[in-house]
Protein backbone atom coordinates (compact mmCIF):
# COMPACT_ATOMS: atom_id res chain seq x y z
CA UNK A 1 0.00 0.00 0.00
CA UNK A 2 1.31 3.47 -0.88
CA UNK A 3 -0.30 6.53 0.71
CA UNK A 4 0.36 9.85 -1.08
CA UNK A 5 -0.82 13.42 -0.59
CA UNK A 6 -2.61 14.92 -3.59
CA UNK A 7 -1.14 18.42 -3.52
CA UNK A 8 2.59 18.22 -4.31
CA UNK A 9 4.11 19.99 -7.31
CA UNK A 10 6.49 17.39 -8.81
CA UNK A 11 8.30 16.40 -11.97
CA UNK A 12 7.87 13.10 -13.81
CA UNK A 13 10.57 11.20 -11.90
CA UNK A 14 8.35 11.50 -8.83
CA UNK A 15 6.09 8.80 -10.26
CA UNK A 16 9.07 6.51 -10.83
CA UNK A 17 10.09 7.09 -7.20
CA UNK A 18 6.58 6.16 -6.00
CA UNK A 19 6.88 2.89 -7.95
CA UNK A 20 10.28 2.25 -6.37
CA UNK A 21 8.81 3.01 -2.94
CA UNK A 22 6.14 0.37 -3.52
CA UNK A 23 8.78 -2.20 -4.55
CA UNK A 24 10.86 -1.43 -1.47
CA UNK A 25 7.81 -1.97 0.74
CA UNK A 26 7.10 -5.30 -0.98
CA UNK A 27 10.68 -6.46 -0.31
CA UNK A 28 9.93 -6.10 3.40
CA UNK A 29 13.31 -4.86 4.66
CA UNK A 30 11.41 -2.44 6.94
CA UNK A 31 7.87 -2.09 8.24
CA UNK A 32 7.53 1.40 6.75
CA UNK A 33 9.15 2.99 3.72
CA UNK A 34 9.09 6.78 3.48
CA UNK A 35 10.04 9.23 0.75
CA UNK A 36 12.53 11.83 1.95
CA UNK A 37 13.06 15.29 0.46
CA UNK A 38 16.25 17.34 0.81
CA UNK A 39 15.17 20.27 3.03
CA UNK A 40 15.69 23.83 1.79
CA UNK A 41 15.01 25.60 5.09
CA UNK A 42 14.10 24.70 8.70
CA UNK A 43 10.34 24.19 8.64
CA UNK A 44 7.87 23.42 11.39
CA UNK A 45 5.39 22.15 8.75
CA UNK A 46 7.13 18.84 7.98
CA UNK A 47 8.28 15.73 9.74
CA UNK A 48 12.03 15.02 9.73
CA UNK A 49 13.62 11.71 8.79
CA UNK A 50 17.10 11.00 10.17
CA UNK A 51 18.69 8.40 7.85
CA UNK A 52 21.56 6.20 9.02
CA UNK A 53 23.47 6.83 5.77
CA UNK A 54 23.61 9.15 2.80
CA UNK A 55 22.68 6.38 0.37
CA UNK A 56 19.60 6.61 -1.87
CA UNK A 57 17.86 3.99 0.30
CA UNK A 58 18.76 3.97 3.97
CA UNK A 59 17.52 2.63 7.28
CA UNK A 60 16.15 5.38 9.51
CA UNK A 61 17.62 6.24 12.89
CA UNK A 62 14.72 8.45 13.99
CA UNK A 63 11.57 10.16 12.74
CA UNK A 64 10.25 13.34 14.36
CA UNK A 65 6.98 14.95 13.28
CA UNK A 66 6.88 18.76 13.00
CA UNK A 67 9.64 19.84 15.41
CA UNK A 68 10.14 23.47 16.41
CA UNK A 69 12.39 25.65 14.24
CA UNK A 70 15.50 25.25 16.42
CA UNK A 71 15.20 21.46 16.40
CA UNK A 72 14.54 21.52 12.64
CA UNK A 73 17.80 23.48 12.14
CA UNK A 74 19.65 20.88 14.23
CA UNK A 75 18.16 18.04 12.18
CA UNK A 76 19.11 19.73 8.90
CA UNK A 77 22.70 20.08 10.17
CA UNK A 78 22.61 16.32 10.84
CA UNK A 79 21.53 15.61 7.21
CA UNK A 80 17.88 14.92 7.98
CA UNK A 81 15.27 14.80 5.22
CA UNK A 82 11.77 16.22 5.10
CA UNK A 83 8.97 13.70 5.19
CA UNK A 84 7.03 14.10 1.94
CA UNK A 85 3.97 12.51 3.53
CA UNK A 86 4.34 9.39 1.42
CA UNK A 87 4.20 6.07 3.25
CA UNK A 88 4.54 2.56 1.84
CA UNK A 89 3.89 -0.62 3.79
CA UNK A 90 2.44 -4.09 3.50
CA UNK A 91 -1.28 -4.30 4.23
CA UNK A 92 -0.55 -6.98 6.84
CA UNK A 93 1.60 -4.44 8.74
CA UNK A 94 -1.21 -1.86 8.82
CA UNK A 95 -3.79 -4.41 9.95
CA UNK A 96 -1.52 -5.68 12.73
CA UNK A 97 -0.75 -2.09 13.80
CA UNK A 98 -4.46 -1.18 13.80
CA UNK A 99 -5.26 -4.20 15.99
CA UNK A 100 -2.45 -3.30 18.39
CA UNK A 101 -3.73 0.29 18.77
CA UNK A 102 -7.49 -0.29 18.64
CA UNK A 103 -9.49 -3.10 20.21
CA UNK A 104 -11.77 -4.31 17.39
CA UNK A 105 -12.87 -7.65 15.98
CA UNK A 106 -13.90 -6.81 12.42
CA UNK A 107 -14.71 -3.94 10.08
CA UNK A 108 -18.22 -3.37 11.49
CA UNK A 109 -16.82 -3.23 15.04
CA UNK A 110 -14.14 -0.73 13.95
CA UNK A 111 -16.75 1.34 12.09
CA UNK A 112 -18.92 1.49 15.22
CA UNK A 113 -15.94 2.67 17.32
CA UNK A 114 -14.78 5.29 14.79
CA UNK A 115 -16.30 8.34 16.53
CA UNK A 116 -14.55 7.39 19.77
CA UNK A 117 -11.08 7.04 18.27
CA UNK A 118 -8.37 9.40 19.42
CA UNK A 119 -7.79 12.21 16.89
CA UNK A 120 -4.08 11.75 16.11
CA UNK A 121 -2.20 11.65 12.83
CA UNK A 122 -0.52 8.55 11.44
CA UNK A 123 2.82 10.37 11.79
CA UNK A 124 2.48 10.78 15.58
CA UNK A 125 0.58 7.56 16.34
CA UNK A 126 2.64 5.19 14.20
CA UNK A 127 5.69 6.62 12.42
CA UNK A 128 7.34 8.33 15.42
CA UNK A 129 7.10 5.07 17.39
CA UNK A 130 8.09 2.67 14.60
CA UNK A 131 11.61 1.21 14.89
CA UNK A 132 11.76 -0.45 11.46
CA UNK A 133 11.74 2.35 8.87
CA UNK A 134 13.65 2.93 5.66
CA UNK A 135 13.76 6.04 3.49
CA UNK A 136 14.06 6.57 -0.24
CA UNK A 137 15.73 9.89 -1.08
CA UNK A 138 13.85 11.79 -3.77
CA UNK A 139 16.04 14.13 -5.81
CA UNK A 140 13.51 15.63 -8.24
CA UNK A 141 11.38 18.74 -8.03
CA UNK A 142 8.98 18.76 -5.10
CA UNK A 143 6.94 21.49 -3.48
CA UNK A 144 4.05 21.18 -1.08
CA UNK A 145 1.30 23.14 -2.84
CA UNK A 146 -0.94 23.17 0.21
CA UNK A 147 -1.69 26.90 0.04
CA UNK A 148 -2.83 29.37 -2.61
CA UNK A 149 0.41 31.33 -2.10
CA UNK A 150 2.48 28.28 -3.02
CA UNK A 151 0.19 27.53 -5.97
CA UNK A 152 0.75 31.05 -7.28
CA UNK A 153 4.51 30.60 -6.81
CA UNK A 154 4.67 27.42 -8.92
CA UNK A 155 2.40 28.69 -11.71
CA UNK A 156 4.58 29.60 -14.70
CA UNK A 157 1.93 32.01 -16.00
CA UNK A 158 -0.43 34.15 -13.95
CA UNK A 159 -3.36 32.74 -15.92
CA UNK A 160 -4.47 29.37 -17.22
CA UNK A 161 -7.32 28.99 -19.68
CA UNK A 162 -9.44 31.72 -21.26
CA UNK A 163 -8.53 34.74 -19.10
CA UNK A 164 -8.05 38.43 -19.87
CA UNK A 165 -6.32 40.44 -17.13
CA UNK A 166 -6.69 44.21 -16.94
CA UNK A 167 -3.36 46.06 -16.70
CA UNK A 168 -4.30 47.24 -13.21
CA UNK A 169 -4.68 43.71 -11.78
CA UNK A 170 -1.98 43.07 -9.18
CA UNK A 171 -1.15 39.86 -7.33
CA UNK A 172 -3.80 37.99 -9.30
CA UNK A 173 -3.65 34.42 -10.52
CA UNK A 174 -6.57 32.87 -12.37
CA UNK A 175 -7.20 29.25 -13.35
CA UNK A 176 -10.18 28.93 -15.67
CA UNK A 177 -11.14 25.36 -16.56
CA UNK A 178 -14.36 26.42 -18.29
CA UNK A 179 -14.75 27.27 -21.95
CA UNK A 180 -16.18 30.68 -20.97
CA UNK A 181 -13.75 33.65 -20.87
CA UNK A 182 -13.05 35.38 -17.57
CA UNK A 183 -12.33 39.12 -17.55
CA UNK A 184 -10.40 40.50 -14.60
Spans of features found by a protein language model:
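Conserved hydrophobic/aromatic beta-strand scaffold that supports enzyme active sites
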Residues: 32-34, 48, 62, 86-88, ...
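A conserved mid-domain beta-alpha-beta active-site/ligand-binding segment of alpha/beta enzyme cores
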Residues: 72-92, 98
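Conserved beta-loop-beta/alpha segment of the NTase-like Rossmann-fold superfamily
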Residues: 1-54, 95-100
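A short, charged helix-loop
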Residues: 51-81
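Glycine-rich beta-alpha junction loops
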Residues: 8, 39-42, 67-69, 88-93, ...
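Flexible, glycine/proline-enriched loop segments at strand-loop-helix junctions
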Residues: 5-12, 58-63, 81-85, 112-113
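Short, basic and Ser/Thr-rich N-terminal targeting/leader segments
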Residues: 4, 31-33, 42-45, 80-82, ...
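Left-handed beta-helix
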Residues: 89-184
